[in-house]
Amino acid sequence: SRKQKFDKKFIKLVIVVDHSMVXKXNNDLIAI
């Protein structure tokens, strides 16, 4: 479905943003 595709893109975006904030030790989003 369209929503699932959007969710996957959003999750990828969140992971990319999270990686850019590794300095803050913000790794909980990757663990989900």
Curated annotation (Swiss-Prot):
One of its GO terms (molecular function) is metal ion binding. It is an enzyme of class 3 (hydrolase). Residues 10-32 form the Peptidase M12B domain. Used for quantification of normal prothrombin (CA-1 method). Signal peptide: none annotated. The keyword Metal-binding applies. It is found in: Secreted. GO terms for biological process: proteolysis. Keywords: Blood coagulation cascade activating toxin, Calcium, Disulfide bond, Hemostasis impairing toxin, Hydrolase, Metal-binding, Metalloprotease, Protease, Prothrombin activator, Secreted, Toxin, Zinc. One of its GO terms (cellular component) is extracellular region. Its cofactor is Zn(2+). Binds 1 zinc ion per subunit. Expressed by the venom gland. Transmembrane segments: none annotated. Calcium-dependent prothrombin (F2) activator. This protein may activate prothrombin via recognition by the regulatory subunit of the calcium ion bound conformation of its gamma-carboxyglutamic acid (GLA) domain, and the subsequent conversion of prothrombin to active thrombin is catalyzed by the catalytic subunit. Heterodimer of a metalloproteinase subunit and a regulatory subunit comprising two disulfide-linked lectins (14 kDa and 17 kDa chains) (AC Q9PRP7 and AC Q9PRP8). Belongs to the venom metalloproteinase (M12B) family. P-III subfamily. P-IIId sub-subfamily. This is Zinc metalloproteinase carinactivase-1 catalytic subunit. It comes from Echis carinatus (Saw-scaled viper).
